[in-house]
Amino acid sequence: MTLQAAPRSAAAQQREPDLRQEVHDAARRARVAARLLAVVPTGVKDRALHAAADAILAHVDRILSANAEDLDAARAADTPAAMLDRLALNPQRVDGIAAGLRQVAGLPDPVGEVLRGYTLPNGLQLRQQRVPLGVVGMIYEGRPNVTVDAFGLTLKSGNAALLRGSSSAARSNEALVNVLRSALDSEQLPADAVQLLSSADRSTVTHLIQARGLVDVAIPRGGAGLIDAVVRDAQVPTIETGVGNCHVYVHEAADLDVAERILLNSKTRRPSVCNAAETLLVDAAIAEHAMPRLIGALQDAGVTVHLDADEQDLRREYLAMEIAVAVVDGVDGAIAHINEYGTGHTEAIVTTNLAAAQRFTERIDAAAVMVNASTAFTDGEQFGFGAEIGISTQKLHARGPMGLPELTSTKWIVWGEGHTRPA
């Protein structure tokens, strides 16, 4: 995806200032809402989250009807199966979305948490505490659940959300956001704490990520093209998320029963998500007898195996039932390969050798490193802190699954008694 549109018609060029104004007006409304939410008590936010969950369940037929229209349009456009899976809602998934809001309501509120505090020799009392980021711009592809996840996490952390989802999920997102706004209104909270930028024009994204002074952070969540375009063109701070060229490395001291289970779970559980394995690395010392078993297991599960993987294969995020395979020379060979081809998301080693595992965890440059565990565990809920707004693959300001604390900044509060600084 590129944010720089192809040559624009005269009508589109004429509408450009209007789109910019629409985005900026929405951001200003979000700013007002964010300032109100920053001081809303935890109990009030939690009641609103439960009200939103109730409203989603009460309007499930309306939500599924809108989603069915999106799916019909996507199928007519020959959308790949993996993308259809991301787009699709059903009663069970809607139940899960509502349950996610209730789970967020039960999590500790990070706002106001004191990270450190002390008194200086001169008597000044210092306290560093968490505060909301402010206005969070979310740009994401065809996953309606992200709409609700973003709402829940931003609300609980005292932020306002400006959402720009994919046009492929436009009807689903509109139905969900309308329900969420009504729930906020019913709890006397500002409905503008969640707004959907509904224009399909890609310049909407550009205006959002260049709204300095109005948007505090932009979080792109989707494929490599979307993320790269946002990071390249943004004039507001961004948090890079999600591209997952994840590896499973089977060390020479691996238990092959364990390796097979981990490999299949990492690849086939949900191949269209960013924590799915995309490359199998096999230690040269065991390749002769391990490769037939592991490759056979993948093929039996319906995975297309790229044995003669080239440079493009090794850098590809398949997001499908496909995987690249490479043989590496020991743990150092695996480390070198992953640090060259990985995207800093999640990497796994399967081994019974503690020294090899420690060397791997210390030297792999990634947000999450698994030892004898599936890459599928890199997930906010699985990590024990509820829904996530994304999985950051950068090192500032957050890294790994981003929950509530990652949607805050800090503020220093200094108490004095008429203190003045000496000349």
Curated annotation (Swiss-Prot):
Task: Tell me the HAMAP family matching this sequence.
Answer: ProA
Give the UniProt subcellular location, in the record's own words. Cytoplasm
Q: Where is the composition biased (Low complexity)?
A: 1-14
> Chief location of this protein?
cytoplasm
Q: Which organism is it from?
A: Mycobacterium marinum (strain ATCC BAA-535 / M)
Q: Outline what the protein does.
A: Catalyzes the NADPH-dependent reduction of L-glutamate 5-phosphate into L-glutamate 5-semialdehyde and phosphate. The product spontaneously undergoes cyclization to form 1-pyrroline-5-carboxylate.
Q: Which InterPro entries does this UniProt record tie to the protein?
A: Ald_DH/histidinol_DH, Ald_DH_C, Ald_DH_N, Aldehyde_DH_dom, G-glutamylP_reductase_CS, Glu-5-SA_DH, GPR_dom
* Catalysed reactions, semicolon-separated: L-glutamate 5-semialdehyde + phosphate + NADP(+) = L-glutamyl 5-phosphate + NADPH + H(+)
| GO MF term list | glutamate-5-semialdehyde dehydrogenase activity; NADP binding
Q: Which gene encodes it?
A: proA
Q: State the protein's name.
A: Gamma-glutamyl phosphate reductase
Keyword terms: Amino-acid biosynthesis, Cytoplasm, NADP, Oxidoreductase, Proline biosynthesis
Q: What biological processes does GO assign it?
A: L-proline biosynthetic process
Associated pathway: Amino-acid biosynthesis; L-proline biosynthesis; L-glutamate 5-semialdehyde from L-glutamate: step 2/2
In residue numbers, the region (Disordered) covers: 1-25
Q: Name one GO cellular component term.
A: cytoplasm
Point to the regions of Basic and acidic residues compositional bias. 15-25
At the top level, the lineage of the source is Bacteria
Assigned protein family = Belongs to the gamma-glutamyl phosphate reductase family.
Report the enzyme's class at the first EC level. oxidoreductase
Catalytic activity, EC? 1.2.1.41
